[in-house]
């Protein structure tokens, strides 16, 4: 009995909707199946209504995907549905902007901004929404991407010990400075490169400077103390 009542009510509702649509143009788009081919819709008003239905469904499912009671399979299925809905929404948007709308406008509807804000994260050519970012394949892909990024940096631990010195890293040492000072003028003369007078003078002065050794410093300190002691004794 109840099934017959429900069937009669549904028939009555459909009849009333048809009358309302024919009389005043009212149509409950949520009760109809969306067209698969968006190009068949020639009315911009109808296209906007279908796009609004897609936006509502995206909003509902993007909220549901955060449900902690969902298992991994349900999350993956829901994420695939959201990917398909997002593609459908883009088809409607393109059809409206490039086919039906005579003059393009920058004004965005409220549901459009919601869809764009909740468009998920694009990973390896696919969008992932909400808890779908916690799926094993997503974590594995992010780990591989991180390893590839880390591989581009220099790891000094992999450098051989005999190469891990000042010369390998390009640090300036006294020996390197002396070598450059001695050979700069020679190499420039060999390759016919004009030598700057300031550089030549600096190179000559560098060659003339005697860098004291540790033994020289010890000898100098002994002589200084000896002279100071002799001055105190008036010798």
From Swiss-Prot:
Cysteines joined through disulfide linkages: none
InterPro entries, sorted: Helix_hairpin_bin_sf, Isy1, Isy1_sf
Pfam families attached to this UniProt entry: Isy1 (PF06246)
Location in or out of the cell: Cytoplasm; Nucleus
Keywords, in A-Z order: Cytoplasm, mRNA processing, mRNA splicing, Nucleus, Spliceosome
Top-level taxon: Eukaryota
The keyword Cytoplasm is annotated on this UniProt entry: yes
Transmembrane region(s): none
GO biological process terms, semicolon-separated: generation of catalytic spliceosome for second transesterification step; mRNA 3'-splice site recognition; mRNA splicing, via spliceosome
Gene Ontology CC: catalytic step 2 spliceosome; cytoplasm; post-mRNA release spliceosomal complex; post-spliceosomal complex; Prp19 complex; U2-type catalytic step 1 spliceosome; U2-type catalytic step 2 spliceosome
Note: Present with 1990 molecules/cell in log phase SD medium.
Function: Involved in pre-mRNA splicing and cell cycle control. As a component of the NTC complex (or PRP19-associated complex), associates to the spliceosome to mediate conformational rearrangement or to stabilize the structure of the spliceosome after U4 snRNA dissociation, which leads to spliceosome maturation. The cell cycle arrest of SYF2 defective cells may be due to the inefficient splicing of TUB1. Also involved in DNA repair.
Assembly, per entry: Belongs to the NTC complex (or PRP19-associated complex), composed of at least CEF1, CLF1, ISY1, NTC20, SNT309, SYF1, SYF2, and PRP19.
Family (UniProt): Belongs to the ISY1 family.
Protein known as: Pre-mRNA-splicing factor ISY1
Source organism: Saccharomyces cerevisiae (strain ATCC 204508 / S288c) (Baker's yeast)
Gene: ISY1
